[in-house]
From Swiss-Prot:
Homodimer. This is Protein GrpE. One of its GO terms (cellular component) is cytosol. The lineage of its organism: Bacteria, Pseudomonadati, Pseudomonadota, Gammaproteobacteria, Alteromonadales. Belongs to the GrpE family. It is found in: Cytoplasm. It comes from Shewanella sp. (strain W3-18-1). The keyword Cytoplasm applies.
Amino acid sequence: MSNESIKAEQDLIQEGVESEVSTAEASLVDELTQANFRIEELEQLLADALAKVEEQKDSVIRAAAEVDNIRRRAAMDVEKANKFALEKFANELLPVLDNMERALMGTNPEDEATKAIYQGVELTQKSLLTAVAKFGVKQIDPQGESFNPDQHQAIGMQPSADFPANTVMLVMQKGYELNSRLLRPAMVMVSQGGPSQETATIDIEA
């Protein structure tokens, strides 16, 4: 076989190899292109899915917050209703307690004829005060205490050698508070002090 024949055969083989390589490269490029398109599609699907998840998550969070707000408002409404009902009950109870107080003041505990009545009213009053104290109702009896305008209402002032100035010398009507909130101030007479003391003055509500 001549050199020319050998060269021609080699060229033919090389062309065949190059053709195969070219075809393989084209096929690979096509596969890679399709793979890239598929990857982009999957990435878009993933992004859409994540967006939906975030949207649903946000909806769940908003719904949970709304439920929490509704629950909180309902609890506040119940608390307000309970406070209103308790305050109304306590205010309606004050005249009963006042009547018991007046009955005790008008009855002589040393008189055998009225001693049993006095003891009965006193026991009933104590039992009632103990019962309402469980609901936060507390009696204000400031006898001998310093005048407190937040809890006491002065109906007058008098000189007194027995009580320092601005001291409650007489409780005309006891006050009451509900859970540390004033229901009614105590009606009191306030001392101006003795003759040697400097005269004290306070606002007196008519």
